[in-house]
A protein has these predicted regions:
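Active-site neighborhoods and metal-handling regions in enzymes and metal-associated proteins
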Residues: 1-384
């Protein structure tokens, strides 16, 4: 995991305590792109390992002007005397929970105190706009993460049987991911039976029993880029009739939701479409009545379908699992979105969630996980 994904996105540098300064209009060309790194020592090398040299940092980042962080205060003052506006970065991820004051916040406060007449602005909105659109190299890295995820999932399907523990399943994923130079993209969710109904179940310590479904929300990262996969499999190797009904219903919604990822559509519209699809499937499953489809509510969270499908249908993915992006902006070519419809039935100790990662293009959505088994027959065939 990189200390700062924004810094990595702009420079390729993933070393802690690094500073990037961009000043395109600086009079001195050497000050238009500058990278500041922590200077290493023999003691640091012994305790922490190798740190980048200046030439190595240039090779990684393409930035020629590399300095030690000890030089930063003096250089910053020189830049501030020339600059009028200063764009500063903070963690504005909508899912961020920051209870302790960060180094970024302390730096901003100090800078405002020393230079009160400068114009300070937020760089986060610009980075959100840039990062949500993936270039071909980024897409290739996500594809590779998906291929590692596929290997892990197929290994687990061959392993799972009644009596194994959820933690044993997690270990199988870990083995396959690490041997392929990947890592867990996020804390794995491996829930059998009733645990499948817990959206962010993380205990992963219960026995998988015959007749249970096993919900697997587990995926790999590679070179700091993430994938995000969910599959639901039968512990005994075959779905019951009811499990198969729910499974096929969710799969139909997944297929339709993938097809609905088109440039120009707003996330809220896409979400509403998914909820309508799930609601109609819930009628067929006996979870809702036809009259429930006609209920009009001013608060979307009060829709009858929310009892069975209560979360978002997907999100951008990239350097962050829930990647940056303005969700009130239209989808555009280059976005990579997860698609993750579900139906949760706690009364039956049954939940099905399915999730693939999809690239939005002008010529239609491209499912980056199209080769990962998802049809019920495919799952059962692998588990024989």
């Amino acid at each position: 995991m990189v200390p700062n994904t924004d810094l990595f996105y702009l420079s390729g540098i993933e070393q802690e305590e690094s500073i990037l300064v961009l000043f395109p209009s600086a009079e001195d060309e050497r000050m238009r792109e500058m990278l500041f790194l922590r200077e290493t020592s023999e003691l640091i090398a012994i305790w922490e390992g190798h740190k980048l040299t200046k030439p190595q940092a240039t090779e990684v980042s393409g930035i020629r002007s590399v300095h030690w962080t000890a030089d930063f205060p003096r250089t910053l003052h020189r830049l501030m005397c020339e600059a009028q506006s200063v764009w500063l970065n903070t963690n504005e991820h909508k899912r961020a929970v920051v209870e302790v004051e960060s180094r970024d916040v302390r730096f901003i406060r100090d800078l405002r105190s020393r230079y009160p007449l400068h114009d300070f602005r937020r760089v986060a909105p610009l980075l959100h706009t840039l990062r949500v659109v993936k270039d071909p190299l980024e897409v290739d890295l996500i594809r590779h993460a998906c291929s590692i995820t596929k290997a892990g999932f197929e290994r687990v399907c061959r392993f799972v049987e009644p009596g194994v523990n959820e933690c044993d399943v997690e270990a199988e994923f870990a083995h396959e991911f690490i041997r392929r130079r990947g890592a867990f993209a996020y804390n794995p969710i491996i829930g059998a039976g009733r645990n499948s109904c817990v959206l962010h179940y993380l205990d992963n310590d219960q026995v998988c029993r015959s007749g249970d479904v096993l919900l697997l929300d587990v995926a790999a990262s590679y070179a700091n880029y993430n994938s995000d996969l969910t599959r639901t499999i039968p512990v005994s190797g075959r779905f019951t009739r009811r499990q198969r009904q729910v499974y096929d219903a969710v799969l139909r919604v997944l297929r339709a939701s993938i097809a609905g990822l088109t440039p120009g559509k707003i996330w809220s519209q896409w979400q509403a479409e998914a909820e309508d699809l799930v609601a109609r499937e819930c009628v067929g499953l006996g979870l809702l009545k036809p009259k429930d489809l006609k209920v009009k509510v001013t608060d979307p969270s009060k829709k009858p379908v929310k009892k069975w499908f209560m979360h978002g249908n997907g999100h951008p993915i990239g350097l962050d699992v829930h990647d940056l992006g303005h969700m009130n902006q239209p989808f555009a070519t280059g976005w990579v979105m997860t698609v993750e419809p579900a139906i949760y039935i706690p009364e039956e100790d049954l939940a099905v969630r399915l999730e693939n990662d999809v690239l939005i293009t002008e010529n239609g959505p491209v499912d980056l996980m199209a080769d990962i088994p998802i049809e019920a027959e495919e799952i059962e065939a692998m588990m024989k």
